[in-house]
Amino acid sequence: MRRGFDALLLALPLAAAAAPPCDKPLYLSFDTGHMGVAPLVAEVLARQQVKATFFLANERTLSGGSSLDDQWAPWWKARAAEGHAFGSHTWDHDSWLADVGTAVRVKPSQGPQAGQVRTLDAAGYCAELQRPAQRFEAMTGQKMQALFRAPGGKTSPALLAAARSCGWSHVGWTPAGFLGDELPSERHSNAQLLQRALRDIRAGDILLAHLGIWSRRDAWAPAVLEPLIAGLKQRGFCFATLRDHPQFAAVPTR
C-alpha cells in the first residue's frame, strides 16, 4: 500500500507539469459561413488540441444546403463531442439596423426573408436566438450556453434588452481579435493578416473568424489558422472556450 501511495505522490508533479496553469488565455471563436473550410478548421483544431467557441446561424453553404441542415448535423455532433463550446448567431443572420421603441429593425441575410427589412419585438428576437439552440440540441443532444453574437457585432440598447429578457448574453470580440478573414484578400493578404495578429493579440482577447467567407478569394482558413495557433502558443498563449471566460462562465445553458 505504501509503495502505491509513494508512486501516486511521484506522479502528481508530473501531471501538474504536463498541464501548467493557463495565465495567458485566448478565446478563439468562429461564426458560421459557407462551411467550405469547416472540415479543415476541425482538423487544425484537433491537431493543435485547441477548443473553440462556435456561433451558429442557418447560413447558405457551398453545397446548396444550409449550415444547420441534416448534412452538417454529424459535423456539429462531432465538434460537441470534442468539447467545443457553442452559441447563437441568430437563425436567419439578422443584422441590426435601428431601434424602434423596444423593438428592433433588422435585415436577415438568410432564410425566406433574406434582404428584406423586418421589425422584431422582444419575443421575435428571442425566437431568432433560440432557434439555433433548439436545432443544436436536436443535432447533438447537448444544450447550448445562452451566449450569442449579433451578426456584424451590431447591437443596440433595445436589442440587448430583448436578449436579456430571455436570458441571452452578447459576446463580441476584441479589436486585435478581429482576424480579418472577411476582408478582401486583394488588399489584406493572408501573410499580412497573420503578421498583424501575431503582433497585436494580447492575453484575454476574444478572436473572431468564420467557417467560410463568400467574398474572400484566398481562404483565410486553414492557411492562416494553423500558423497563427502555433505562433501564439510559442509566445506563451493558451486557448480556452468562452465557457471559461470570467465574464461568461456563469451564463446558463438554454
Task: Please annotate each region the language model reported.
Residues 1-11:
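Sec-dependent signal peptide recognition
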Residues 11-18:
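N-terminal signal peptide c-region/cleavage motif recognized by signal peptidases
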Residues 19-20, 52, 62, 217-254:
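C-terminal domain-boundary segment and adjacent tail
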Residues 19-104, 109-113, 117-120, 124, ...:
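Active-site beta->alpha N-cap acidic-glycine motif
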Residues 30-33, 55-59, 89-93, 150-153, ...:
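Active-site-proximal beta-strand/loop segments in catalytic clefts of secreted hydrolases
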Residues 98-105, 182-187, 217-223, 251-254:
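Histidine/acidic-residue-rich catalytic or RNA/ligand-binding cores of hydrolases
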Residues 154, 159-200, 236-248:
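His/Asp/Glu-enriched short active-site or ligand-binding loop at hydrolase and phosphoryl-transfer sites
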